[in-house]
């Protein structure tokens, strides 16, 4: 067995994918020191190391040349991912991928320097992923793959995984200021110092903005980041500290009929007191080692977060006098450890790589509350809980190179969950333990004529909110079944991923990937955060096709074109229909980056977000949206850098998000469906829309020291 083949084994098992640099943020070991690797400069050959077609790495250069309207849009560098918002800028974004409306993160696992960012049993929704504390200028790379195809994939990874890594070194300190429409003002300062043969990077960010909304957003955001890194490719240690805080006023979605009849402007609000405040403080530690033919990785993290979120989606449907605003609140302490070890061996003269690992996570959530409010003042508590949730994951994986053109990967993951809920109603308190096993299999064939083929079959899962696991009584006074018994739901839900794909390198500098996939879920269990109950939904299936192209035309031009089509349906038959509301169907993304010379560079992006069913019978569908963003940068001299971003260049009047449900605004009180005291008062079913911002200009001035 030659060294190149063993290198392929190590790369694929260590998470190094297409077009990824060997030194990915200094946090992850790629190959063993005794093994050579096919590479050009710092880039691994695109055909080496992948275990599925739908994986890759986003580099710092790709992020720098992409116009961004919000931090979480760095995930849109992943083919097929759409990032939207239906509320204020301090709230977690809404994500779409592979036939999923992922809500605020369910079924897409995201991490930052080893810290999991999906929150279990969250006040607003299971898997809540707030990325507003990201500083895009500090991102070194993003590793991603679709489907729960790796043994490293645990909870929330059924649709995919994104691992974000920050810089471990800084070329030059800088300070920059960004000005934009709607009183946008952002300051960012980044510096570094050498300490004991290592490097400490520090950054501070402050941002304020009112947005285009009639009711100004009054966003105030502060971010402090510190990271120390010491070591090299053989062994390295890093630890970091980050503190983030934000407060904002939100404009939630509004009924479309009130916009169409002229009673509301697209940017109006029906409850100006919506909004919130959020805090997050994180400590983390990473240690990586390799020696001869083995490697090990250890990480630990501690996170303290707080959230108070005020929302009103139905306005005056439930309470014609005080309105329907509610508060979701929590204070959380998150602790965790992760260890992974790999070693190479031979089995009947075949090169083999084995990996074992384990992770432990503990969430201690206090004051997990759902409260009825008016103008952010509580007047009733629907429920309040203290939750302690513990998760243990263990896994093992074996990879064998049977032939130069044939590799197999077999893995098994086990997860154990313990839920402990102390509710304000004893009927809804309780403890529950559950476990699940997730086998995974991949077969990699080729390359033949610069084309490599992949077969993946993997079991995954997602957990349900702990409150849904122990709830036995409906405590929502707004519901007609108030104080009626409820069935508790299964803690863990099985998913199955299947994928066939290829990765081609048919001409120089062009990488093309094609994936045909299917994902089955036993149940779309959903905890309704604004009701305090869990709604078990129906089993589902999703399938689709993804095509991605990345072309490095030369040293100064990069082009990418990605298209995805998905079909999402409930498996069982029902009179209401089998469409999954909000499920993404079609997306298209295209971009170009052009570096004219050492001074000028340009970037452009087009994003198409196709129409989708908003209710089960597909009789109501959302509109599509197409947005074009542009970026131009100019290096005036060695110290001064300028950049202009023009967002939504065509000034398209499109919506960021659309829903369909019943509500009552005061403007509707003259109708029977919304008249206070009316026996027919059930609300007006309509699309509810949250618009994208119009044309938006931003200017950045950076001084490099």
Protein language model regions, located:
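Short acidic/polar hinge/loop motifs at secondary-structure boundaries
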Residues: 116-146, 164-165
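C-terminal beta-signal and adjacent terminal beta-strands/loops
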Residues: 63, 611-612, 634-705
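Gram-negative outer-membrane beta-barrel transporters
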Residues: 342-344, 511-521, 536-617, 700-704
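Membrane-embedded beta-barrel scaffold of Gram-negative outer-membrane proteins
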Residues: 288-290, 295-313, 446, 452-460, ...
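Extracytoplasmic beta-strand/coil segments of soluble accessory domains associated
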Residues: 72, 76-119
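Transmembrane beta-barrel wall of Gram-negative outer-membrane proteins
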Residues: 174-208, 213-251, 274-293, 343, ...
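N-terminal periplasmic "start-of-domain" segments of outer-membrane beta-barrel proteins
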Residues: 33-66, 91-94
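Face-selective signature of the C-terminal outer-membrane beta-barrel domain
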Residues: 236-244, 276-424, 444, 506, ...
């Amino acid at each position: 067995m030659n060294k190149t083949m063993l290198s392929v084994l190590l790369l694929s098992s260590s998470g190094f994918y297409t077009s990824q640099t060997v030194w990915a943020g200094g946090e992850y070991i790629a190959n063993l020191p005794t093994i050579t690797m096919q590479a050009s400069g710092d880039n691994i050959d695109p055909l080496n190391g992948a275990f599925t077609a739908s994986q890759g790495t986003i580099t710092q250069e790709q992020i720098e040349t992409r116009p961004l309207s919000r931090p979480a849009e760095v995930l849109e560098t992943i083919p097929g991912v759409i990032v939207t918002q239906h509320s204020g800028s301090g709230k977690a974004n809404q994500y779409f991928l592979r036939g999923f409306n992922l809500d605020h993160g369910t079924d897409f696992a995201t991490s930052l320097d080893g810290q999991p960012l999906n929150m279990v049993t969250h006040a607003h929704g299971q898997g809540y992923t707030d990325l507003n504390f990201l500083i895009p200028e500090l991102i070194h790379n993003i590793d991603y793959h679709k489907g729960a195809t790796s043994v490293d994939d645990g909870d929330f990874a059924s649709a995919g995984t994104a691992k974000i890594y920050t810089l471990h070194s800084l070329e030059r300190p800088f300070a920059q200021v960004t000005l934009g429409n709607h009183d946008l003002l952002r300051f960012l300062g980044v510096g570094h110092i050498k300490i004991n043969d290592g490097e400490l990077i520090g950054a501070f960010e402050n941002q304020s903005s009112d947005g285009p909304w009639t009711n100004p957003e009054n966003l105030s955001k502060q971010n402090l980041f510190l990271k120390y890194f010491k070591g090299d490719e053989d062994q390295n240690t890093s630890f970091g500290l980050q503190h983030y805080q934000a407060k904002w006023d939100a404009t939630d979605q509004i009924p479309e009929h009130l916009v169409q009849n002229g009673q509301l402007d697209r940017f109006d609000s029906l409850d100006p007191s919506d909004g919130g405040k959020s805090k997050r403080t994180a400590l983390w530690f990473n240690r990586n080692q390799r020696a001869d033919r083995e490697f090990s990785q250890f990480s630990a993290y501690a996170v303290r977060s707080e959230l108070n979120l005020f929302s009103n989606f139905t306005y005056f449907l439930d309470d014609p006098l005080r309105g329907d605003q509610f508060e979701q609140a929590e204070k959380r302490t998150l602790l965790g450890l992760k260890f992974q070890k790999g070693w190479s061996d031979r089995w009947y003269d075949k090169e083999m790589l084995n990996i074992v690992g384990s992770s432990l996570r503990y969430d201690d959530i206090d004051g997990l509350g759902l409260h009825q409010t008016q103008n952010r003042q509580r007047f009733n508590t629907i429920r309040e809980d203290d939750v302690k949730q513990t998760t243990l994951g263990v896994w093992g994986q074996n990879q064998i190179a049977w032939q130069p053109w044939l590799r197999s990967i077999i893995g098994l993951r086990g997860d154990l969950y313990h839920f402990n809920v102390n509710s304000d109603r004893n009927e809804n308190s309780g403890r529950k333990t559950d476990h699940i096993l997730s086998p995974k299999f991949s077969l990699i064939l080729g390359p033949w004529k610069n084309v490599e083929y992949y077969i993946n079959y993997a079991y995954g899962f997602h957990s349900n909110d702990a409150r849904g696991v122990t709830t036995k009584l409906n405590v929502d006074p707004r519901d007609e079944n108030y104080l009626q018994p409820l069935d508790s739901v299964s803690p863990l839900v099985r998913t199955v991923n299947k994928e066939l794909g290829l990765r081609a390198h048919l001409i120089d500098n062009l990488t093309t990937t094609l994936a045909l996939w299917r994902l089955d879920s036993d149940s779309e269990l959903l905890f309704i955060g604004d009701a305090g109950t869990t709604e078990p939904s129906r089993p589902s299936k999703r399938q689709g096709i993804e095509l991605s192209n990345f072309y490095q035309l030369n040293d100064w031009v990069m082009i990418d074109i990605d298209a995805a089509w998905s079909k999402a349906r409930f498996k069982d038959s029902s009179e209401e229909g089998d469409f999954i509301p909000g499920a993404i169907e079609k997306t298209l993304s295209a971009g170009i980056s052009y570096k004219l010379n050492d001074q000028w560079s340009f970037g452009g992006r087009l994003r198409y977000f196709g129409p989708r069913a908003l209710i089960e019978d597909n009789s109501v569908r959302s509109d599509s949206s197409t947005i074009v963003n542009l970026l131009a940068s100019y290096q005036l001299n060695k110290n001064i850098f300028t950049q202009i971003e023009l967002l939504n260049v065509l000034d398209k009047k499109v919506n960021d998000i659309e829903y369909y449900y019943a509500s009552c605004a005061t403007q509707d009180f003259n109708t029977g469906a919304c008249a206070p005291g009316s026996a027919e008062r059930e609300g007006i079913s309509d699309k509810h829309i949250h618009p994208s911002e119009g044309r938006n200009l931003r200017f950045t001035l950076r001084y490099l020291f």
